């Protein structure tokens, strides 16, 4: 991803490409769901961290695309703007924080971290591999669709 060093990946280039692959494969735009990526600065990671991070982000974005906007909700609120956003940047201590935020129906009281679905097992495993803490909350900007959901991944400087 445009790096002369093949072991280093710039997330500002890599993560938008992960999102593009989801757009091509799952076509969320055809359902009225807009995906967006904001990585506020150049964040370079070793490939050993960047690849599992990309898989983790992909799983969280796909989960939002599949579950945050059920068809009946999109039909009921056709003028609503369905969004899934990926936001990334550095923390004060030079760690990394990434959030996947949607303005969909929300979790409805379900705690996904207690589930043993393949997706949640994958999210937990990749988080552990990265030495990261992952949390989820109801979104802070309710929409016509519901409360939304926010997943936040914090990776300490040096990761593992």
PLM feature spans:
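ATP-lid-like helix-loop hinge signature
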Residues: 66-93, 138-144
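Short beta-to-alpha transition helix within the HATPase_c
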Residues: 8-25, 31
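Conserved short strand/loop->alpha-helix "switch" segment adjacent to the catalytic nucleotide/phosphoryl-transfer site
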Residues: 9, 27-61, 65-70, 76-83, ...
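ATP phosphate-binding glycine-rich loop and adjacent ATP-lid/helix-beta elements
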Residues: 110-137
